[in-house]
Structures are given as C-alpha cells and as structure tokens.
C-alpha cells in the first residue's frame, strides 16, 4: 500500500515539473543607450548549461529560465549578430 502511495506522489511530482511553464526572466533595465547594446547570443544554442537566449533593452543575454512570466525570448534570425550592435 505504501509503495502505491509513494509511486502516485512521485508521478505527480514529475508531472508538475514537466508541465510547469518556464519563461525568460523579466529585465530590470527598461532602457539602454545605443552604444551599450550587446548581444551575447542570438538563439538558445548559443547558451550553455540549460540557459536561454533572452532579449533585454541592452541586447540578448543567456539567462536561466524562471517560472515567472514577464521576460522575452530572443527572436534570433539571420540579422542577429553577437557582439556590440550599432544601429
């Protein structure tokens, strides 16, 4: 009996981990001078250790996902370049 309860609780715990939504963290910066815009990444593959490429006003940076919405994932694309971006 105890093993069945444990199995059900374990399954519920795994399900909650799999089904929980993940987001880029919300940036605390609301504006950035054009000369300070830098992209460390253009897509998730540019990041390591399970981090995502997230967009901020100062460029794209690798961040670890969070369960709180508010951030924005980097769009990437052919026009995205890493390094300092001058418009």
From Swiss-Prot:
One term of GO molecular function: toxin activity
Keyword line: Antibiotic, Antimicrobial, Disulfide bond, Secreted, Signal, Toxin
Cysteines paired by S-S bonds: 24-54, 32-58, 41-53, 42-80, 47-62
Tissue: Expressed by the venom gland.
Domain annotation WAP: ranges: 21-66
Gene Ontology biological process terms, A to Z: defense response to bacterium
Signal peptide: 1-20
Alphabetized InterPro entries for the sequence: Elafin-like_sf
Entry comment on modification after translation: Contains 5 disulfide bonds.
Top-level taxon of origin: Eukaryota
Family statement drawn from the similarity comment of this UniProt entry: Belongs to the venom protein 11 family. 01 (wap-1) subfamily.
Protein function: Has antibacterial activity.
Protein name: U15-lycotoxin-Ls1f
